[in-house]
Amino acid sequence: MSEPLVIVGNGMAAARFCEELVERACGRYAIAVIGEEPRLAYNRVLLSSLLADEVSAADVELRPARWWRDRGVTVLYGQPATAIDPAIRRVRLANGASIPYSKLVIATGSRPIRLTAPGMDLRGVRVFRDFADVADLRCAAKGARAVVIGGGLLGLEAAYGLVKGGAKVTLVHLMDRLMERQLDARSADMLAREVEARGVEVLLGAETTKVEGIRRVEGVRLADGRVIEADLLVVAVGVRPNTDLARAAGIDVDRGIIVGDGLQTSVADIHAIGECAEHRGQCYGLVEPAHEQARVLARRLAGVNAHYRGSALATNLKVSGVRVFSAGDFLGAAGTEAIVLSDPGLKTYKKLVIANDRLVGAVLFGDTTDGPWYFDLIRSGTSIDAVRNELVFGRTFASLPADCPQNNHDEKLGNEPPERAASLTYAISN
């Protein structure tokens, strides 16, 4: 008889875990997925494209209903879990039902961070996190005067989508550059100019102190006294792990649900993966680590002695229509050397950081074709001494030895082939 396995959460981590588990242990488990949102699992990365009307709702769905049925997976979407009872091994639902489990996987993701400035409870204040948020913003965008708070990925994508939807948009960011965790000063400046060219006003070093209005948003007040008129405010200042169910069940929680290398929580037969999990003090909040955790846990529950050791991080994204990539120490610590290649004509920028004949960091803007290959070099620690002079021009121009890591991600990412610049700025600094 199949063991009852329950997954709380129906996002990208849960979907990947199901895919991996049914492939490796078909029939071993009777799988039930509990989802808070009233729809099947979807690709959250594409929400910005959905907001910008570049893809359809069908395009963001990860798997059709038939796929889940054919593999014997029961999906209870639109039925939030309200409690986990480890003593009797049951999950309670909002409708009063409860589901038994032999093994439980918590994949509850994260929640948007809410600001506490006065006026944040007014009508017209929105977040940008899930499918319902996209639907709300698409309805509100036409002709709106919108302010987006947050210059990270979510804020930029919200601003871009709102402009495409017909809104006049001002983006307000507390820090002195956009995407400060993923980009250096120069690439962030290039991004700001590209975002403004697409119709978004960008205000950096700007702190929001109050939302003006009586019943609904009328404006946003900044610390310097300026007031930006607005009837729509989107708060996109980050997310935090959704740990409520785990904490209430007595599972150890810090910032996220604490897991070991086996993705096991402090309670027997309860695991956690994705944005809600904290491994070795790290909460990732990114898709690829969630997928890696899902693969490891599926292997373990299929009887394989697999372990999760953490994830090397890289950013490879399309932000407001512009491709950006970063990995490793792209800012350059003391004792490192930076090689920079810039082409204002093609609006491309590449910075490689080298230490002890090893590539330790990279940031790319505009053309990210070689990003995954650089990431392989960073992770492997391969000596780049033999191709040092050609490395900045990309894999096509750097004839590495056969045993060096090769990038096999290009087809998956759909990157365009590299273009050569007519005029380049090439610099080395240390």
Which role does the model predict for each range below?
Residues A30, V75-R92, I99, G165-G260:
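A Rossmann-like FAD-binding core segment of flavoenzymes
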